[in-house]
């Protein structure tokens, strides 16, 4: 990679990102602009995928809201995300948990890793 591009991307990387994997339950504090004011909206769900690397890394969080599955994809190093909290670590054997989209209720649960 070009050294100039590499130095620019390294300066934009965030260092306050916790270590999380697919299967973990996270709370994402995202800044939302409504009209002329800005507020923080918390989106809590299971990480179903992480893709990319460096400045272009993204992760997808899935939750069930009023019986409807909602997925949101966030860039990992964006300033629009105030912070990420890892609520619990899940035990899964896949990197992409897209199969959770077809499951409902207790079948969609993920075992927790005990430490």
Curated annotation (Swiss-Prot):
<dbReference type="Pfam" id="PF01245">
    <property type="entry name" value="Ribosomal_L19"/>
</dbReference>
<dbReference type="GO" id="GO:0003735">
    <property type="term" value="F:structural constituent of ribosome"/>
</dbReference>
<protein>
    <recommendedName>
        <fullName>Large ribosomal subunit protein bL19</fullName>
    </recommendedName>
</protein>
<dbReference type="InterPro" id="IPR008991">
    <property type="entry name" value="Translation_prot_SH3-like_sf"/>
</dbReference>
<dbReference type="GO" id="GO:0006412">
    <property type="term" value="P:translation"/>
</dbReference>
<dbReference type="InterPro" id="IPR018257">
    <property type="entry name" value="Ribosomal_bL19_CS"/>
</dbReference>
<keyword id="KW-0689">Ribosomal protein</keyword>
<keyword id="KW-0687">Ribonucleoprotein</keyword>
<dbReference type="InterPro" id="IPR001857">
    <property type="entry name" value="Ribosomal_bL19"/>
</dbReference>
<dbReference type="GO" id="GO:0022625">
    <property type="term" value="C:cytosolic large ribosomal subunit"/>
</dbReference>
<comment type="function">
    <text>This protein is located at the 30S-50S ribosomal subunit interface and may play a role in the structure and function of the aminoacyl-tRNA binding site.</text>
</comment>
<comment type="similarity">
    <text>Belongs to the bacterial ribosomal protein bL19 family.</text>
</comment>
<dbReference type="InterPro" id="IPR038657">
    <property type="entry name" value="Ribosomal_bL19_sf"/>
</dbReference>
């Amino acid at each position: 990679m070009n050294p100039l591009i590499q130095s620019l991307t390294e300066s934009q990387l965030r260092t306050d990102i916790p270590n999380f994997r697919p299967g973990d339950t996270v709370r994402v504090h995202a800044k939302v602009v409504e009209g002329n004011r800005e507020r923080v909206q918390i989106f809590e769900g299971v990480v179903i995928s992480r893709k990319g690397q460096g400045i272009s890394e993204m992760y997808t969080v899935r939750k069930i809201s009023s019986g409807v599955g909602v997925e949101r994809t966030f860039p990992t190093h964006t300033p629009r995300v105030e912070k990420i909290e890892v609520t619990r670590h899940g035990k899964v054997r896949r990197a992409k948990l897209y199969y959770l989209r077809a499951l409902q209720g207790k079948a969609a649960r993920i075992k927790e890793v005990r430490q």
